[in-house]
Amino acid sequence: MDGSPEVTAFILAGGKSTRMGSDKAFVEFDGRTLLARVLDLARSVTQDVRIVGSAEKFASFAPVVEDIFRDCGPLGGIHAALRSSLSELNVMLAVDTPFVSWTLLQYLISQARATPDAIIVVPASEDRRQPLCAIYRREFADVAENALRAGNNRIDRLFDLVKTRTITEAELNVAGFSSGIFRNMNTPEELKTEEGRV
């Protein structure tokens, strides 16, 4: 061991929050900001927690990683996160998914440990992979960088380029997780509707 943590968690907080009308990270949900919720969640699985976003906005909350490829969406954030990481396993979490649980993260990490040849371990829900609640090994940074340099910002196009362990919705259900766990908050109306369900 070289002293680096086995797991680092990254909060992806660089979105524009256009539909929300204000920065999602600081929107309150059941009495706490979405950022505070996801920081606590991330810290429940590792002490090494970082925010991918603006240092000006987030430096007082946790160490911040800023995008190397600007305005390239989540793939740019994941790339920057992995370039900054010394960990083999890297948890990526969107700031606006308050229903993701500690038990789900532990499950994903255990699946990543059980499939050491998988570069990505990603759950699927309603026939869609959930790349913003997934585990990435550091080497995915090279794949992401090649795509970003070529102008391809779509992460879903990259899953087939590397060994990817997709956890099916059926597997998640057997493990006790519902598809609703990945719901994200995009509008004030969604926040209001979902409050009280955490």
Residue ranges with predicted function:
Residues 2-155, 160-180, 192-197:
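Nucleotide and nucleotide-moiety/phosphate-recognizing core
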Residues 183:
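Dinucleotide-binding Rossmann-like beta1-alpha1 core, especially the glycine-rich loop
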